[in-house]
Amino acid sequence: MKYYAAFALLLVACQPDQPAATTKPATAAPSNAAEPSARPPADTLHVADSLGHPAGVLRLRPSTKAAFDQLRAADPLPQRPAEREEAAVASGQKAPANLDAPLPADGRVQRRGETLVFRPAQGPAVTLRPVPSSPDGPEGNDIGYAYWGSLPAAHQWVVDVTTDEGPAVLLLDQRTGRRTDLLGAPALSPDGRYLLSVCEDVASGGTPTEMSLYRVDGPIPQLVWNRALGDWGPRYARWRDARHVVLALAHAAPSGDVAEGAGLPLTYAELELPATR
């Protein structure tokens, strides 16, 4: 299964903008500078729906790491399983054999060896098994699954997916077992109506960099808009309220060097979503 082919049409819907507020780290104001009386001016990003039709204008304003950190408790998901594995390897530890987050106590999600089993309220159980790589491919699995967590307000289980093309995310509906494929990490709005998916790989460009908004208060997640990005992109997203999200942004190096880009610091911006019905 190719996760990225399904998103190809979405990613070409519009060309990436280059908002000044997000492409360079903010410089500190002098200590004697007057406190601004109004919010800084916003940069804009135009977004499109699944057919490429205009779906609104996003506004971005500079934010801070402190503002992002204050919203940590609002994130219902633990650290991503793949990131825990990377952290263990980077610290010289052996990567855990089982990357699952703690499974729900109600027994509706079970790990049986390499297989994950989900039991929705209606319909048959959903079984996820790793897909082995082809004999002439690299060692390991082409597709692997780890339980990431639950979004009860949206009635979704979240699965971290590793593929031969890069990371992805799978949502499984806790009511019906219906699957929804995402490219990026999901962040659920405080009112449980919307889910923002962010995917970032600006350093190497090996996977798409984009963000997508889904409406999740109905029977199935519905794509509202999608936005492809260029030399900057959101690595993490945390909602402040029903229309504002603080983003941690990664940046590509001006030289295009991957190692240099990986060493650039994150910057922060607040995203204001267009009004939706």
Task: Tell what function each PLM region has.
Residues M1-V12:
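Sec-dependent bacterial lipoprotein signal peptides
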Residues C14-D17:
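Bacterial signal peptide processing site
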Residues P30-W157:
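Terminal domain-start segments
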Residues V159-D164, S197-T209, L247-A253:
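Beta-strand C-termini and the immediately following turn/loop, strongest in propeller blades
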